[in-house]
């Protein structure tokens, strides 16, 4: 019984030591002389050891190549924020997958709390640049209804997804009217 009590107290102490930390990043991506529109960007917190990496936020660049991401997590130690870009700029059509660029973000922009109080402006990046330690992403999780990556929207099929959802809502309305 005493061992269980000690374990419970230790777990409560560990939980209390966890602190909310957050970060935000914004910028603009180019592909040559023009904006890199609909480029997938993600904000990660990378962990070492058995603790899995945490996806803090994700999205796509707008028509001007601009993005803004922010997110946070509870960690015992300071977070290691990383910004990732997945793109096909200046890429051979024969190569599979997308180019993956990973940039570490300055720890000075980490703030306490669930909402970031400071935003790191990464500036303008031209994706024609070959970055050090650049990788390729060969597998991409696609949208599954209500499952993992349910918020994933493929920009190439966004019009199809929107028309499908409007058709589904029209079918539901027709069903309601029938009964």
Swiss-Prot record:
Chain intervals with Basic and acidic residues compositional bias: 157-179
GO cellular component: cell surface; extracellular region
Secreted is among the record's keywords: yes
Location of the region described as Disordered in the Swiss-Prot/TrEMBL record: 144-179
Chief location: secreted
Coiled coil region boundaries: none
Subcellular location: Secreted
Signal peptide coordinates: 1-17
PANTHER family for the chain: TRANSTHYRETIN-LIKE FAMILY PROTEIN-RELATED (PTHR21700), TRANSTHYRETIN-LIKE PROTEIN 46 (PTHR21700:SF124)
Protein name: Transthyretin-like protein 46
Organism: Caenorhabditis elegans
């Amino acid at each position: 019984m005493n061992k269980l009590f000690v374990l419970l107290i230790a777990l409560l102490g560990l939980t209390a030591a966890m602190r909310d930390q957050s970060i935000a990043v914004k910028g603009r991506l180019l592909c040559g002389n023009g904006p890199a529109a609909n480029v997938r960007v993600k904000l990660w917190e990378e962990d070492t050891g058995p603790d899995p990496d945490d996806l803090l936020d994700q999205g796509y660049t707008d028509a001007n190549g601009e993005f803004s991401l922010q997110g946070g997590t509870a960690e015992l130690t300071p977070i290691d924020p990383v910004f990732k870009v997945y793109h096909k700029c200046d890429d051979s059509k024969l190569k599979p997958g997308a180019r993956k660029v990973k940039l570490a973000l300055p720890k000075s922009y980490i703030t306490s709390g669930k909402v970031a109080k400071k935003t790191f402006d990464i500036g303008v990046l031209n994706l024609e640049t070959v970055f050090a330690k650049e990788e390729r992403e060969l597998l991409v999780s696609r949208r599954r209804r209500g499952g993992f990556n349910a918020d994933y929207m493929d920009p190439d099929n966004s019009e199809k997804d929107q028309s499908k959802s409007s058709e589904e809502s029209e079918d539901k309305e027709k069903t309601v009217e029938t009964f």
